[in-house]
UniProtKB/Swiss-Prot annotation:
Pfam families: PCMT. GO terms for biological process: methylation; protein modification process; protein repair. Its main location: cytoplasm. It catalyses: [protein]-L-isoaspartate + S-adenosyl-L-methionine = [protein]-L-isoaspartate alpha-methyl ester + S-adenosyl-L-homocysteine. This is Protein-L-isoaspartate O-methyltransferase. One of its GO terms (molecular function) is protein-L-isoaspartate (D-aspartate) O-methyltransferase activity. The active site is at 92. Residues 1-27 are annotated as: Disordered. One of its GO terms (cellular component) is cytoplasm. HAMAP family: PIMT. Gene3D superfamilies: Vaccinia Virus protein VP39. Keywords: Cytoplasm, Methyltransferase, S-adenosyl-L-methionine, Transferase.
C-alpha cells in the first residue's frame, strides 16, 4: 500500500505532547524495547494531521506492531510503511491504519467485522477500541494467514476479544450480523452488497473503493431508518478484495477486460 496523497486538518482540541517521546501514553510498559520507536511513530502520525483521534493514537501506542510482522521486518515495524507478511499480502502502513480507525470510530461494547485479518494487527487495535464489552470478528481468506493472526493475537493477549475465521470476506459473516462497524482492508470495485446488508442501522463501514491500482477510502453509513449514505476521504492503494462480491482470483485479467 502506498501512503495517502491527501492529508487531514489537525484537530485543535488534541492536547499537545511534551517534547520528544516523553509524552506518557496510558498502558505502556517501560520494559518494552520497542516502546520509544512506537511512541515516535505515534507522535509523527499526530503531527502529520493524518490521525488526530486521541483514542486511536493511544491504541496504536499500546499495540506492539513489531509482533505482527515477520522477524526479519521487526526493525522496520514502526516506520510508516506497509510490510510483507507472506502469501502476497501486506500489513498496511500505520498512517493508513490509523486513518481508517479514526473514520470508523468504533466504541466500547460494539461488535465489529474486520475483513482481511492479515497478521491480526488491525484486529488488535479494534479490540483495544471496543473494550470493554465489545467483540471483533475477523475474516481472512488465506488459511495460513488466519492461523498466523490467531497466533499473534494469542501472544499479545487479544484472543479473548477477537475471533478469526477463514472465509470469503466479501460475503461477511452473516451468522454474527448485524455489526456496528465494518472495516475492510482490501479494495473492492464497489461496496459488497452482503457487507452493506450486515451493517446495523446507525452503523458505519470503511472500505477502499476503486480499481486495483488506485482507490478512495470510502465511508458508508446506514441511517437508523435503513438508508445508505457514502462519503469519500483520501486516496489509498490496497491489495484487491478477492471474493464473490469483490475481485476474482484472476483479477488482473478481469481488470484489463473492463478497460478494453
Amino acid at each position: 500500500m502506498k501512503s495517502p496523497v491527501a492529508g487531514a486538518v489537525l484537530d485543535p482540541s488534541t492536547p499537545p505532547p511534551t517534547t520528544g517521546t516523553s509524552w506518557r501514553w496510558p498502558g505502556l510498559r517501560d520494559a518494552d524495547p520497542y516502546r520509544e520507536a512506537r511512541l515516535r511513530m505515534v507522535e509523527q502520525l499526530r503531527r502529520s494531521g493524518l490521525v488526530t483521534s486521541r483514542r486511536v493514537l493511544e491504541a496504536m501506542a499500546r499495540v506492539p506492531r513489531h509482533l505482527f510482522v515477520p522477524p526479519e521486518y521487526r526493525g522496520m515495524a514502526y516506520e510508516d510503511r506497509p510490510l510483507p507478511i507472506g502469501h502476497g499480502q501486506t500489513i498496511s502502513a500505520p498512517g493508513v491504519v490509523g486513518r481508517m480507525l479514526q473514520l470508523l470510530d468504533p466504541q466500547p461494547g460494539e461488535k465489529v467485522l474486520d475483513v482481511g485479518a492479515g497478521s491480526g494487527y488491525q484486529s488488535a487495535l479494534l479490540a483495544e477500541l471496543v473494550t470493554p464489552g465489545g467483540r471483533v470478528y475477523a475474516v481472512e481468506r488465506i488459511p495460513e494467514l488466519a492461523e498466523y493472526a490467531r497466533e499473534n493475537l494469542e501472544k499479545t493477549g487479544y484472543r479473548g476479544v477477537v475471533e478469526v475465521v477463514v472465509g470469503d470476506g466479501s460475503k461477511g459473516l452473516p451468522q454474527h450480523a448485524p455489526y456496528h462497524r465494518i472495516k475492510v482492508a482490501a479494495a473492492a470495485p464497489k461496496p459488497p452488497k452482503p457487507l452493506v446488508e450486515q451493517l446495523a442501522p446507525g452503523g458505519r463501514m470503511v472500505i477502499p473503493i476503486g480499481t486495483p491500482d488506485l482507490q478512495i477510502l470510502t465511508i458508508i453509513e446506514k441511517t437508523p431508518d435503513g438508508r445508505v449514505r457514502e462519503r469519500r476521504d483520501i486516496e489509498v492503494l490496497f491489495v484487491p478484495l478477492i471474493g464473490e462480491h469483490g475481485y476474482r482470483e484472476d483479477w488482473r485479467k478481469q481488470y484489463w477486460q473492463w478497460w478494453r
